[in-house]
Amino acid sequence: MTSVRGASKTGRTSKTSTATTALVLACTAHFLVVFDTSVITVALPSVRADLGFAPASLQWVVNSYTLAFAGLLLFGGRLADIHGHRRVFLGGLAVFTLTSLIGGLATSPASLIAARAGQGAGAAVLAPLAVTMLTTSFAEGPRRTRALTISTAVALVGGASGNLLGGVFTEFLSWRSVLLVNVPIGIPVLFLAARVLAGPRKRPWGRVRLDLPGAVLATAGLTLLTLGVSQTHEHGWGEAAVAVPLAGGLLALLAFVVVEARFAASPLIPPRLFGLPGVGWGNLAMLLAGASQVPVWFFLTLSMQHVLGYSAAQAGLGFVPHALVMLVVGLRVVPWLMRHVQARVLIAAGAAIGALGFWWQSLLTPDSAYLGGILGPAVLISIGGGLVGTPLARTVTSGVGPLDAGAASGLMNTTRQFGGAFGLAVLLTVTGSGTSGSPAELASHYGDAFVGIAVFMLAIAVLTPVLPALARSTPPGVIHVSPVAR
């Protein structure tokens, strides 16, 4: 479990300090990961002009991050279980910070793409570890709920501020600043983590080895699937550029299942996880949540710039209501509701409200005013997302022991990330959305995409009856800090 030096010397005050430090580090890591998923999007035209990208290769500035991130998430989660939170956190953050610096100083398309892949690799370690540090520092109950709520809210702010600051930095500074900004954040956090996180001690469950064959197969399978899905915008589903990586990815994942079930002494995803009621159905709901949340940034950015004619900075500002509403709902409303309402009821209600918001967003036209075209839908979308996020994360991680915390977090983040890539690819393929056409034509295409996202949200609501009925967060929570350091 996560431990801070000196935490075992005192009682509740020290435990509170330990958990608070874990929360700060986890939220910072979560913010950086989500921020860099969205920050580069608005800057792509400037990147293309400065480095001379060919139009067809520009997508790899985004895809290289996504491929490395999705492909290595399971590996990153299990790595933390085996080698300890401190060592893996420092390594992942160091890789992320260094490759951000390299990307900001890139002089060619190849160097920028390689740096973005390095960022994705670092993010694949940080993302599951951010959740693991919370679930191993806070016992199930109100305190864990609040910690997960804060982390979810910070991630949502990271996504919204990525769009906002990406536009502002690109318009008033340079596209390079959207990557270089990670450096002055990452370096002090590295020093803080190195100082306060305790090193590993002997684990009560003995020596555990990393399942390298499983890691290779899972990484290859997820990378190939993500690659195939990401190609569907440029190629048909039956073309070799899509079909070959999809087939290869499915074969690799089939081999992964066989290896894990028959040969692995320490599986990358321990089969016992799927005996927990929230893991199977919960991760399917998380897949749909990713398919709903990730595409909204893409299509709403295009809607504001190409339908309403906003500048990059104005489009970034358009996301501020999303962040503000989600913060209020996540930090104030959800913790109170979870003390009185079942988690799956909140998930169903949030999914229905979010679906209504996305349907409203689909009605956007070139003549829409900001109030009815952006702000109104944003309120419903953000309320829905806020109600779904923390209860679903709690459902997926409920009952997971400390030995499997990293694997469970890695699985949850993998399903969410792959759901985002898959949802975006499906919506792009079905709607034929692009950037060429009149504002009215583009509004129609983007509107179809928002209807598709509403369908994903409704599917989450349909799934809620099979999710476990978790106990309400009424008992007073106790922060749980193990003497076993990571």
Swiss-Prot record:
One MF annotation (Gene Ontology) recorded for this entry: transmembrane transporter activity
Subcellular localization, as worded in the UniProt entry: Cell membrane
GO biological process, one term: response to antibiotic
Presence of keyword Transmembrane: yes
TM stretches of this protein: 24-44, 56-76, 88-108, 121-141, 153-173, 178-198, 210-230, 241-261, 284-304, 317-337, 345-365, 369-389, 418-438, 450-470
Membrane topology: Multi-pass membrane protein
Key words of the record: Antibiotic resistance, Cell membrane, Membrane, Transmembrane, Transmembrane helix, Transport
The keyword Membrane appears for this protein: yes
Major subcellular site: membrane
Family membership noted in the UniProt record: Belongs to the major facilitator superfamily.
Known function: Involved in cephamycin export.
Classification via PANTHER family: BLR6921 PROTEIN, MAJOR FACILITATOR SUPERFAMILY MULTIDRUG TRANSPORTER MFSC
Entry protein name: Cephamycin export protein CmcT
